[in-house]
A protein has these predicted regions:
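An acidic-aromatic pocket/loop used at catalytic or ligand-binding sites
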Residues: 1-113
Length: 113
């Protein structure tokens, strides 16, 4: 459905309207940032790019970006939410496990135009 694999065990959190007919999808994972980046490097056959060191954020481009028709470039972004100042991204499901996700996956699917 999204055009890229979802990391095994990742939990859907929410999708948002990105504008221009696009949506982005947020998933939480109990896996480490390093494990998620390794998974997506393998399945996408792309090394991606570390765009921020702190908090660690890694992006993979998965399609062509057309600034005339798209709000965001299609891609997969992995963000490390665990640090000295954060115990992780809160699980929005009451009583959901884990209580906090150390890592978040954001997917902007390829939209045919």
């Amino acid at each position: 459905m999204l055009g890229v694999p979802i990391y095994p065990g990742a939990q859907f959190i929410r999708s948002y309207d990105a504008g221009r007919g696009q949506r982005y999808y947020i998933f939480g994972s109990a896996a480490s940032f390093v494990d998620l980046v390794g998974f997506y490097r393998n399945v996408l056959k792309d090394k991606g790019e570390l765009v921020y060191d702190v908090p660690a954020t890694h992006e993979f481009d998965v399609g062509k970006y057309n600034e005339n028709t798209m709000a965001f470039p299609p891609g997969v972004t992995i963000k490390d939410f665990q640090s000295d100042v954060s115990r992780g991204f809160p699980n929005p499901n009451p009583g959901g496990q884990p209580a906090r996700f150390p890592t978040i996956i954001q997917i902007v699917p390829v939209v045919a135009r």
